[in-house]
C-alpha cells in the first residue's frame, strides 16, 4: 500500500511499539467518552445560540447545519488527538471529527501486527467492529434500495485507501457502495449525481466541510437531497475554534487545555492554530512575547507531548458512533505532528 511511504520513508513503523496497562487504557477511554460528551454539549449550545460566526462559518449555512443537528443526522466517527504521558490526565489537543485519517492503520493493520508479533496479547481496538455496527444503523435509517457513494480526492493514495476501506466496511454491513472522485459528482438541478446521472442519496465524503462550503457548487448543498456522512453539524467539532469554546464552557476541566480567541490571554509560550488547519498545517509554537497571527487563529496552552527515544508521541483516540473505540499512536522527531508522522502500533501489557 503505497500511502505508507512519504518522501521515501515508511509511514507504518514497526521499529517501536507502545505497551499500555489496562488501567491506562481505562483512563484514555473514559477521557475520550467524556470529551465527546462535552463536544456534543458545545454543539447544542452553538446551534441554539446561533453564533456560528465564531467558527468562521458563513451565515448562509447556519440554518442548514442546525437542521442537520436537530434531525439527529448520524456522526459516524472521529479521532481525538490527546497528549498523555501515563500519569497526568489526557489532554485534548483537537478533535478530528470530520475527515480523520490513519483509520486503516488503527482499525486493521495494527491488529494484524498484534496477531503476528504479539500473539496472545490484547489491544484497545474495536474500531472495525463498531464501524460495521454504525453502518448497520445507517442501513436501518435509509431506503434499502439506495446506494452509498464514497468520495474524496481519489488520486491521493491515502485518501483512496481510507475511502476504499470505509466502502468495504459499509458493504460488510449489507449496503451497496460505490466510489467516485469528488470531481466526478454532478448536479442535475435538484440532486447531486454520479457519472451515470443517478441521484446520490447518501454520500460518505473524505473531503473537509470547509472546502465544500467554499466551492462554486456550495449553494446546492442547501437544496439538495443528499444525506452526508459526516453530517454537516460535525464541521463545528473539526473546527479549531471549538477549543476556546469548550474552555469557556468547561473552564478547568482536567481533559481540556486553556484556549482563547485572543493571543493576549497567554503571557508565556503557547500554540497558535489555524481555525481550519489540518495535519499540523497552521500550527505554530509561540515563545513568550511572540505576537503570532491575527487571521482566523486560536491560541491554546502549550502541552508538550511525551518523548520516547527522541520521538514525540501523540495518541489518536477513535470515537465510533458516540463511544471510544480504540487508539493509534503517531510519532515524529518534531513536536508538531504532521502528515508524515509515522504510525506505531500498541498492545496491552
Functional labels for PLM-detected ranges:
Residues 1-349:
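Preference for protein termini
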Amino acid at each position: 500500500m503505497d500511502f505508507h511511504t512519504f518522501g521515501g520513508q515508511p509511514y507504518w513503523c514497526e521499529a517501536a511499539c507502545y505497551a499500555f496497562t489496562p488501567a491506562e487504557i481505562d483512563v484514555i477511554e473514559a477521557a475520550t467518552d467524556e470529551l465527546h460528551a462535552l463536544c456534543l454539549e458545545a454543539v447544542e449550545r452553538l446551534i441554539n445560540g446561533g453564533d456560528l460566526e465564531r467558527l468562521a462559518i458563513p451565515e448562509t449555512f447556519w440554518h442548514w447545519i442546525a437542521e442537520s443537528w436537530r434531525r439527529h443526522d448520524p456522526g459516524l466517527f472521529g479521532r481525538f488527538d490527546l497528549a498523555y504521558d501515563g500519569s497526568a490526565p489526557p489532554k485534548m489537543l483537537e478533535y478530528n471529527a470530520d475527515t480523520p485519517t490513519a483509520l486503516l492503520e488503527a482499525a486493521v493493520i495494527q491488529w494484524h501486527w498484534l496477531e503476528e508479533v504479539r500473539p496472545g496479547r490484547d489491544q484497545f481496538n474495536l474500531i472495525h467492529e463498531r464501524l460495521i455496527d454504525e453502518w448497520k444503523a445507517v442501513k436501518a435509517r435509509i431506503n434499502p434500495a439506495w446506494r452509498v457513494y464514497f468520495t474524496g480526492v481519489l488520486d491521493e493514495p491515502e485518501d483512496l485507501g481510507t475511502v476504499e476501506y470505509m466502502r468495504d466496511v459499509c458493504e460488510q454491513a449489507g449496503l451497496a457502495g460505490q466510489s467516485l472522485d469528488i470531481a466526478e459528482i454532478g448536479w442535475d438541478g435538484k440532486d447531486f449525481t454520479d457519472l451515470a446521472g443517478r441521484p446520490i442519496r447518501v454520500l460518505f465524503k473524505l473531503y473537509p466541510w470547509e472546502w465544500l462550503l467554499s466551492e462554486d457548487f456550495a449553494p446546492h448543498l442547501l437544496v439538495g437531497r443528499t444525506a452526508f456522512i459526516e453530517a454537516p453539524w460535525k464541521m463545528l467539532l473539526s473546527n479549531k475554534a471549538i477549543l476556546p469554546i469548550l474552555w469557556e464552557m468547561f473552564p478547568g476541566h482536567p481533559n481540556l487545555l486553556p484556549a482563547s480567541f485572543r493571543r493576549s490571554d497567554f503571557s508565556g509560550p503557547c500554540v497558535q492554530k489555524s481555525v481550519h488547519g489540518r495535519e499540523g498545517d497552521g500550527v505554530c509554537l509561540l515563545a513568550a512575547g511572540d505576537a503570532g497571527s491575527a487571521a482566523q487563529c486560536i491560541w491554546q496552552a502549550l502541552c508538550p507531548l511525551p518523548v520516547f527515544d527522541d520521538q514525540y508521541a501523540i495518541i489518536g483516540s477513535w470515537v465510533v458512533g458516540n463511544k471510544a473505540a480504540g487508539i493509534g499512536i503517531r510519532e515524529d522527531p518534531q513536536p508538531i505532528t504532521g502528515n508524515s508522522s509515522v504510525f506505531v502500533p500498541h498492545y496491552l501489557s
